[in-house]
Amino acid sequence: MTHEEHHAAKTLGIGKAIAVLTSGGDAQGMNAAVRAVVRVGIFTGARVFFVHEGYQGLVDGGDHIREATWESVSMMLQLGGTVIGSARCKDFREREGRLRAAHNLVKRGITNLCVIGGDGSLTGADTFRSEWSDLLSDLQKAGKITAEEATKSSYLNIVGLVGSIDNDFCGTDMTIGTDSALHRIIEIVDAITTTAQSHQRTFVLEVMGRHCGYLALVTSLSCGADWVFIPECPPDDDWEEHLCRRLSETRTRGSRLNIIIVAEGAIDKNGKPITSEEIKELVVKRLGYDTRVTVLGHVQRGGTPSAFDRILGSRMGVEAVMALLEGTPDTPACVVSLSGNQAVRLPLMECVQVTKDVTKAMNDRKFDEAMKLRGRSFMNNWEVYKLLAHIRPPVSKTSATMHTVAVMNVGAPAAGMNAAVRSTVRIGLIQGNRVLVVHDGFEGLAKGQIEEAGWSYVGGWTGQGGSKLGTKRTLPKKSFEQISANITKFNIQGLIIIGGFEAYTGGLELMEGRKQFDELCIPFVVIPATVSNNVPGSDFSVGADTALNTICTTCDRIKQSAAGTKRRVFIIETMGGYCGYLATMAGLAAGADAAYIFEEPFTIRDLQANVEHLVQKMKTTVKRGLVLRNEKCNENYTTDFIFNLYSEEGKGIFDSRKNVLGHMQQGGSPTPFDRNFATKMGAKAMNWMSGKIKESYRNGRIFANTPDSGCVLGMRKRALVFQPVTELKDQTDFDHRIPKEQWWLKLRPILKILAKYEIDLDTTEHAHLEHISRKRSGETSI
């Protein structure tokens, strides 16, 4: 970018006005989006207005449309719901109402509208835009606006952000609020599990989703439910028989509870609703189980937004402002959405149309089509669910076709490791393999701490944090002889390694060892699982989302304490080794003033600039500061050094406190994202493994010595991909245990702009308008 273009971002909004409103049902994370729109709007030189109470405020005007300031969006990030209010508005559906809304906007010179809401709200916005010129000529004829005002506001730009807990909008992988709603549901499922086990009960849980089964489907994957009912895929006609057989089989195998998840819009093949009460009566009548119904209701909309939703809201808000200010009369109204982990712009009406097509397909009972239209991510969730829940576990048998696969954890514990182990073990058994589990990583493999795992061995593991198998950082090189002996002794034909940077390095060592030891010529795959998110070959690691949420919750509490004492700055040290992922993302999610990381070298002048920035901040109404520091960002500028510097420089203006978060970041129950991600990664790894073993089978034994027989399974942009460890070698900085290129570094400017730094907006995400049809035929997403 040239210097002129740098400058352009800061002046892009001069003379323009943006209005932001939230409409329809509220969703956690809407406040993060509002905050980002306001702050980035002000950063570009535009005036930004809040529209209170959704479209109703737009129609009523007056005090409902107020100018926003930088401070007016402070302390909003961690609040659920929408601070500027939302309402379902009948007036806006009538042309008369839209005429009044247009009048209110023209009088204030607002020609850019950012709408945060569901598909109904966004369709309304598009109608408003298409009528705009007619509305203006009507207002001019009625003498309500002058010709000059009409010319000045000749066209209206509209950008939509999808805020909906149902995740029912086509074209976006995740809508704002969905992840937080899953957090609420999983908290409740975890709580119910303990009481159900105590009494050997069956629970029927009803979750939201009138026309979309996303919440129900992901919940059932995340808690290992016995059955799920979703509107997109009604059960077969004899489902009652199947359900009861499934429940009694689970009990026979020693489980003390059954969980059935029902989406509120669940139907059978004929379109007749399936209710929770109906399911309860069926189970009681046929099986005589003690059965309870819990309807979760509006709990799912409430509570604190998750880290994912805060980051999603912030990223989408920044992109929305850019889309509005770059808009011309010819650009179509667009939706800013997420695909994989990339921000994309999609034509609003294309997305709305596909969303309507899903409803139509369901009404016409074309359920296969409805599933396809929901997108790849939804389909993959459904496939994994069907595998884990509906296929009967095989009776153990020793046949010639059976292969032996071992599963192990390596590195430091990370939440979600157990979910990955569970899904690899069960998918392996379903495919007719013998699955062994190795305790204590490569050390256990050398010592022979290996046992066979059956179906119920991993029962209830999905929601448990840490590593049940035990994990060590030891690398295999020192013990190749013992490891080779055990591979032969236990007849191990494939290895699934779940872990962090050590798992990846261990994989490279196994590759090297193949030259000396033929026994090591077996396929292996690494599933990245570490809080640091520093494994080459993957944008995300299992466990990082849980750690991020732990840091966020702590930062919220610390900010609350600082808000009470006033004029206080907190310096918080996060984990991550040399990788600044946790510090950066937690900085975005918690609204930090700065985040110091190794990947972005800083000097004493930068520290001084931050102190001066905080001195200025204390003069405003926001009298507190939050600074994050990655544990290894600089060997000399330690947490103590930064704390002492801030304490000295801030004397008389603010006082400082420091907090080292430590190992609490590795613990806790895994978040829905980590459970779901780990389950899908485990399933995909085991499928790959079965194929690879068959490929490598020669003359009665396994022999795999090609580079593609040792891979890392990672999420790259929009797809899950297997990459040979040897190919990833060049992309790795081994001294600092990080990948040479990291996607999240491009989000750092957003962090700085939202903290009011005068920087150049040159490296934020540049999303171009794509078409939804092209997106759907792309790579396999997860």
Swiss-Prot record:
Region spans: N-terminal catalytic PFK domain 1: 2-390
Cellular localisation: Cytoplasm
Keyword Membrane: no
Stated regulation of activity: Allosterically activated by ADP, AMP, or fructose 2,6-bisphosphate, and allosterically inhibited by ATP or citrate.
Protein keywords: Acetylation, Allosteric enzyme, ATP-binding, Cytoplasm, Glycolysis, Glycoprotein, Hydroxylation, Kinase, Magnesium, Metal-binding, Nucleotide-binding, Phosphoprotein, Transferase
Region spans: Interdomain linker: 391-403
The protein's Enzyme Commission number: 2.7.1.11
The keyword Acetylation appears for this protein: yes
Modified residues (N6-(2-hydroxyisobutyryl)lysine): K559
Organism: Canis lupus familiaris (Dog)
CC cofactor: Mg(2+)
GO cellular component, one term: 6-phosphofructokinase complex
Positions of modified residues (Phosphoserine): S133, S377, S669, S777
Pathway: Carbohydrate degradation; glycolysis; D-glyceraldehyde 3-phosphate and glycerone phosphate from D-glucose: step 3/4
Protein name: ATP-dependent 6-phosphofructokinase, muscle type
Reported function: Catalyzes the phosphorylation of D-fructose 6-phosphate to fructose 1,6-bisphosphate by ATP, the first committing step of glycolysis.
Binding site for beta-D-fructose 2,6-bisphosphate: 473, 530-534, 568, 575-577, 631, 657, 663-666, 737
Residues that bind ATP: G25, R88, C89, G118, D119, G120, S121
Mod. after translation: GlcNAcylation decreases enzyme activity.
Residues the entry annotates as binding Mg(2+): D119
Record Pfam families: PFK
Family designation: Belongs to the phosphofructokinase type A (PFKA) family. ATP-dependent PFK group I subfamily. Eukaryotic two domain clade 'E' sub-subfamily.
Catalytic reactions of this protein: beta-D-fructose 6-phosphate + ATP = beta-D-fructose 1,6-bisphosphate + ADP + H(+)
Principal subcellular localisation of the protein: cytoplasm
GO biological process: canonical glycolysis; fructose 1,6-bisphosphate metabolic process; fructose 6-phosphate metabolic process
Span list, region C-terminal regulatory PFK domain 2: 404-782
